[in-house]
Amino acid sequence: IKTKTPLTYSEPISIESVSPATIKAGQVLTIKGDYLNLIKRVIFFDGVAVDDTAFVSRTRKQIELKVPVQAQTGKIILSNGAEIPIEVYSKEALNVVLPTFTSFAPTTIKPGAVLTITGKDLDLVDMVEFGGGKIIPSNNFTLNTAGTEIKVTVPEDAHDGAVNLLAKSGVVVENGATLTTVMPSGLSVTPDPIKNNTEITVKGANM
């Protein structure tokens, strides 16, 4: 006797716990459950996936993996990687740490001068954004070893406005304060009047 359709079955993959509940990119996440040896991929919020080849360890009851820098807060998904995959969602959202943007100084600054940004977990910052959409990537600012301070040169064409941090996960972290850029003022030109091909001198504040 033969059946008309193939008989298939699947193991009851389950998630019992995900720890720690709050985690920073680069740290090891532990997932406990059953039949986890069948999992080929762990998917974080917004489709950020870690394949089993990158797992730190895996058994039937537990998976350990490092959280990728692109990961964002949200539920995680376990997938068996089949053509029609079995996907199991965590009950609770995983809280992925973002940079904390405490303050910046000075709040009034001349373009070309150095701005100091303070906070926590600033090693997760990929870019600093100034008013006018001026972006400074991480290879153009300095970060202290504690990850609590960034020093960045204000672009010459930066506008007044907010200073934002762009995390490596793509999330924008705001501070709420406004940066004011100092422009040249009190300008004077000598000699006045002037003839063609004559050298002039411009004086003023914040030149």
Predicted regions and their residues:
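Ser/Thr/Pro-rich low-complexity tracts
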Residues: 1-207
